[in-house]
Every structure is written in structure tokens, then in C-alpha cells.
């Protein structure tokens, strides 16, 4: 059995991205939404498109991908599920000292294949009941293909830096010396993790970076690590419910702006919403076409949590997302007014 991301027609692809819409009531800025609609992108279709599917129905890339893993797994197929808020059937308490991380690593030993689904949805997912939790907020998903060696390198980084809260793993005969197996075991909370950037390629040869930090690093992930690593100014959308770090990056050159409004209407989808209705964790650089999809927020309190993002250059996806964020200002506002709004509402760290 070959493990790979599945697209909207249940075909194997190298990667896909999806942005789930929050639950919305119809107003002058947006159509109503149930909270399960989404836009979808992969490099085969080459553009971000409004999906005809919903995430609470047995169709679409997310459903097909997880069903290919959990539906009828062979003896050599396994998975590592992790989330900072676990589903009910995980039957364990959340551990706030572990990473603010959410995702799935699935693998098949016999076919030397794997995938990584990194997302922002709390309490998701479960092998026995891979349904969907709350529709209230916007969420992001990125799924990429891997081979076992690459999956192992990512697992080794995660064990040391992100330190995810793993639940309901299926090891499927993994060698106990494998980093994938190690990730399923209790993690060393005193591990001397710092920050890290790991380059990897998908099975299709597409280059990516995993940028990650350990909770002991003690700095803002986006401001002090991602922006300087990519050497660019950034616009970042995350869940903000508290004090925000400074706008100026630690390198004293680049800036990180917090997105205040998401507008999908230029992409042919009839939805727009403020960041207060968004739980996604993504960012784009203002130059060089970098896209980041992650699982950690830009808040001072998150400096004490591990987490990471997948960064990659994709001109089509970058162009689409750059049209949806604060650069397309809220209705009736210019770009300059949108930037000024960020400065006015900003709560810098003490």
C-alpha cells in the first residue's frame, strides 16, 4: 500500500493545501457558511479554487487522504497522530508542557512511503471516528508526500524541538531504533532543544523547510525565527488571544505583521471574515513567494510552547494568499489604513 496525499478526485498527488472557512452569517462582506466549506490547491490544478465539497461530507481531499490511511490499513501501515487538544477517544489529559502542534504522520513500511498532514484543527483526528470537530473558526491544512527516511528525519526533529502530544499511534512493526518509533514513546521533557530548520524534499522532488522551536527557546516563533530564517518581511495569520510580540524581527531589519482580515472573494469564493474568526496558522513573505503553514500562534504565551511551520516557495499559492490577507484591506480601507490599523491594535511585549 502506497501512502500519499489524495486530491479532490481521490487521485494521488505530491501535495495539497486547503483553507476551511469559519461559520459565517450573511452580511455585506460575505455569504453565509456552515463552517465546513473550503478552498483547495494542488500543483496539478495550479490555482486556489472553491471546493464543491464540505469537510463534514465523505468527499474531498481531506476525507480521501485519511480514509486511504484509516479505512483498511495493511499490516505495514501505521500512523502518528498528535494534537495539543486531543479528541475524546484519546482518553488522556492534555499536557501543556508539550508542543502546540497538530498533525498526522502516516507511513507504510513495505512501500517506503509516507505523508505528513500539518493542520490547525483542535481535537482532530481519530482512526476510529475521523469526523470533524467544531466548524466555528477558519483552519488550514497542508499535506505532503514523503519517503520513510525523510519522515524519520522530520520525526527526529519533532522529538527534540516541537515535542508533540502523541495519541493512539500505530507502529506497524517499526524498528524500535527508528525516529518514527521514538516519537510514539514518552518524550524527554528536559531535552535540550533550541530552534531548528530542516530542509527536505517530497517524493515528487519539491523542496521544503521545516522551521521549528523547542519551548525552552523562549522567543517568538514567527518574529524571531521564521522571518529571519527566510530573510523577509512577513504577513502572518494566527489565533491571537493575548499579548503580541513586537512587529520588528529580532534581526532588526525585517517586520512581521499580524493579519486582521481574510478575504477569499478575489479567488472566486464568496467569503470574508476578521481574524477573530480564524484559528489558522499561516504566513507569507512579502517577497520571494514563501508560504508557511504551521501550528503555533504569534502570542507571547506561545514562547513557552514548542511548534513549527512548513515553509515552501510556490508562486501560485503565494499570489493567491497575498490577495486574501491584510494587503487586501478590510472593506472601505486602503492598504495604508490596514497597516495603520495593525499598529494601533498592536500589543507589544513588555
From Swiss-Prot:
EC number, UniProt record: 3.1.-.-
Alphabetical UniProt keywords: Endonuclease, Hydrolase, Nuclease
Any one GO MF annotation of this record: deoxyribonuclease II activity
Annotated coiled-coil segments of the chain: none
Other information: Unlike their eukaryotic orthologs the putative Burkholderia deoxyribonuclease-2 are probably not secreted from the cell, as they do not have a signal sequence.
Family: Belongs to the DNase II family.
Protein name, UniProt field: Putative deoxyribonuclease-2
Upper classification of the organism: Bacteria, Pseudomonadati, Pseudomonadota, Betaproteobacteria, Burkholderiales
Amino acid at each position: 500500500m502506497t501512502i500519499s496525499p489524495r486530491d479532490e478526485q481521490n487521485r494521488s498527488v505530491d501535495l495539497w493545501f486547503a483553507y476551511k472557512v469559519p461559520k459565517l452569517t450573511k452580511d455585506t462582506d460575505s455569504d453565509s457558511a456552515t463552517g465546513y466549506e473550503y478552498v483547495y490547491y494542488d500543483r496539478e490544478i495550479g490555482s486556489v479554487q472553491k471546493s464543491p465539497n464540505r469537510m463534514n461530507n465523505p468527499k474531498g481531499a481531506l476525507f480521501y487522504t485519511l480514509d486511504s490511511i484509516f479505512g483498511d490499513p495493511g499490516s505495514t501501515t501505521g500512523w502518528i497522530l498528535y494534537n495539543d487538544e486531543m479528541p475524546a477517544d484519546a482518553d488522556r489529559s492534555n499536557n501543556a508542557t508539550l508542543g502546540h502542534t497538530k498533525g498526522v504522520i502516516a507511513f507504510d513500511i513495505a512501500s517506503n512511503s509516507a505523508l505528513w498532514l500539518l493542520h490547525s484543527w483542535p481535537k482532530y483526528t481519530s482512526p476510529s471516528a475521523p469526523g470533524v470537530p467544531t466548524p466555528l473558526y477558519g483552519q488550514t491544512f497542508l499535506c505532503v508526500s514523503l519517503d520513510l527516511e525523510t519522515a524519520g528525519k522530520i520525526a527526529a526533529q519533532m522529538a527534540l524541538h516541537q515535542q508533540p502530544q502523541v495519541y493512539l499511534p500505530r507502529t506497524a512493526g517499526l524498528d524500535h531504533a527508528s525516529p518514527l518509533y521514538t516519537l510514539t514513546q514518552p518524550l524527554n521533557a528536559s531535552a535540550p532543544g533550541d530552534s531548528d530548520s530542516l530542509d527536505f524534499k517530497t517524493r515528487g522532488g519539491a523542496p521544503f523547510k521545516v522551521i521549528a522551536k523547542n519551548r525552552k527557546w523562549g522567543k517568538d516563533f514567527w518574529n524571531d525565527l521564521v522571518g529571519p530564517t527566510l530573510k523577509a518581511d512577513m504577513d502572518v495569520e494566527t489565533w491571537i488571544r493575548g499579548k503580541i510580540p513586537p512587529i520588528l524581527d529580532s534581526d532588526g531589519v525585517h517586520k512581521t505583521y499580524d493579519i486582521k482580515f481574510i478575504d477569499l472573494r478575489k479567488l472566486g469564493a464568496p467569503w470574508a471574515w476578521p481574524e477573530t474568526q480564524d484559528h489558522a496558522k499561516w504566513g507569507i513573505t512579502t517577497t520571494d513567494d514563501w508560504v508557511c503553514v504551521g501550528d503555533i500562534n504569534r502570542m507571547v504565551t506561545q514562547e513557552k510552547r514548542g511548534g513549527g511551520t512548513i515553509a515552501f516557495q510556490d508562486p501560485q499559492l503565494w499570489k493567491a494568499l497575498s490577495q486574501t490577507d491584510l494587503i487586501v484591506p478590510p472593506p472601505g480601507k486602503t492598504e495604508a489604513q490596514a497597516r495603520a490599523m495593525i499598529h494601533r491594535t498592536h500589543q507589544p511585549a513588555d
